[in-house]
Amino acid sequence: MTTASPAQRKVTRPRADALRNRERIVTAAREMFTEFGPDVPLDEIARRAGVGNATVYRNFPDRDALVREVVCSVMDRTSEAGELALAETGDAFEALERFVHTSADERISALCPMVQSTFDQNHPDLEAARERVEQIVEELMDRAKAAGQLRGDVGVGDLMIVVAQLSRPPAGTNCGVNDRFVHRHLQLFLDGLRAPARSELPGTAVTMEDLRRPCD
């Protein structure tokens, strides 16, 4: 078996400080995209991350690449939270609840407009991250339904819409103020998901395919 030489490994494996810089850039970009939107200057992101402009461009050649990495990293963390919830052996609905609250903290809804307007939504990295999240959410919901704890007339799309709407500040309101109420309102919604259902919902359960269908 041929083993890579130290020189080869040095070329192919990023240094620890380079990885830390990349992580700092992604973290700063996520915070600033959430606070100020997609047009925040990259030099401002570099300043918050504590790195030079050249370091930002060395890691991300353009804004689209940085936005994509931010969205994928948020989805990856959301998936990791979902996998932890799936690994729980206790109450299935409580596991779903914990996952929903954790997902809201990621503030992915604030990034959705950037995904829709700045680059290809079908980029392989983005599709893979999105499919992983959707599969995990479906498994969590199916498990709660099988336990008789989640009403049967809701779909993955229903859950995703509400998490997105409740974790995005209403127009004209302060972002920080809204954060104080997100989990309160999410819990109100989650209580309405419990079986048995107390009312009949209009329409049919919303799927992810429904959300991707173009508006007429």
Task: For each feature predicted by the language model, list its residue ranges.
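Basic, helix-initiating cap at the start of DNA-binding domains
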Residues: M1-R48, A65
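C-terminal peripheral helix-coil segments that are non-catalytic and often amphipathic
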Residues: M1-R9, Q135-A146, G172-D216
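Amphipathic alpha-helical interaction segments
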Residues: R24, E44, E94-T102, D158-V162, ...
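Helix-turn-helix/winged-helix DNA-binding modules
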Residues: G37-P38, R58, R151
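Short hydrophobic/aromatic patch on the recognition helix
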Residues: G50-F60
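Hydrophobic alpha-helical connector segments
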Residues: E69, D76, E80-S109, N122-D125, ...
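Short linear capping/connector segments at secondary-structure termini
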Residues: P113-H123, T204-T207
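Amphipathic alpha-helical packing segments from all-alpha helical-bundle domains
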Residues: Q121-C175, R180-R184
